[in-house]
């Protein structure tokens, strides 16, 4: 029995002080390697995340234009004409005086306007606000919706980009 106890005590002593004696912390080279890996991962993931956020915010423009279309049709039912007046300041003689619709999207990333309206139709536009991050979305800067249901979009170079902007 004495022999077994000596082996057990010897193993515990080795584990306690012998094997782990030199491992007291993290070396500088290990820290540099970890920081380099974190930097590489961040460099790869942040642009993809930013692109995802810009694409997600495009939904705000689409939703605002569809809500504006509903408001225009409601106005037409009451006044027998369409209007380009979104707020009461640009009121017409018909009651309600205007659409009483906000001139900005829900979170304010897009400015809304009815660029043309008459007795037979309208064209609504949502444009990214130049002072906000959504303006850096160069692929889908301006969205348009007409009373006929035509959906168009323009990129920062004013070229058509309908399928990417309206279908995603």
Where are these regions (language model features)?
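N-terminal leader/signal peptides at the extreme start of proteins
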Residues: 1-26
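Periplasmic/extracellular, small/polar-rich flexible segments of pilin-like filament-forming proteins
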Residues: 2-6, 77-168
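N-terminal single-pass transmembrane signal-anchor helix
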Residues: 22-49
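Conserved hydrophobic beta-strand within the GNAT/NAT acetyltransferase core sheet
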Residues: 28-31, 72, 126
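Conserved catalytic core of two-component sensor histidine kinases
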Residues: 35, 62, 69
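Alpha-helix exit/C-cap motif
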Residues: 55-59, 67-88
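Outer-envelope exported proteins of Gram-negative bacteria
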Residues: 64-67, 127
């Amino acid at each position: 029995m004495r022999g077994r106890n000596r082996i057990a005590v010897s193993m515990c002593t080795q584990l306690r002080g012998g094997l782990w004696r030199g491992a007291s912390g993290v070396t500088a080279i290990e820290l540099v390697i970890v920081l380099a890996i974190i930097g590489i991962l961040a460099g790869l993931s942040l642009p993809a995340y930013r692109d995802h956020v810009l694409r997600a915010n495009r939904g705000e423009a689409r939703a605002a234009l569809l809500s504006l279309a509903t408001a225009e049709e409601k106005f037409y039912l009451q006044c027998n004409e369409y209007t380009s007046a979104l707020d009461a300041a640009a009121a017409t003689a018909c009651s309600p005086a205007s659409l009483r619709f906000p001139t900005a999207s829900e979170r304010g990333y897009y400015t809304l306007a009815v660029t043309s309206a008459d007795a037979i139709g309208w064209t609504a536009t949502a444009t990214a606000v130049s002072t906000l991050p959504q303006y850096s979305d160069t692929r889908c800067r301006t969205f348009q919706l007409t009373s006929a249901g035509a959906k168009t979009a323009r990129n920062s170079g004013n070229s058509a980009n309908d399928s990417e902007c309206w279908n995603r």
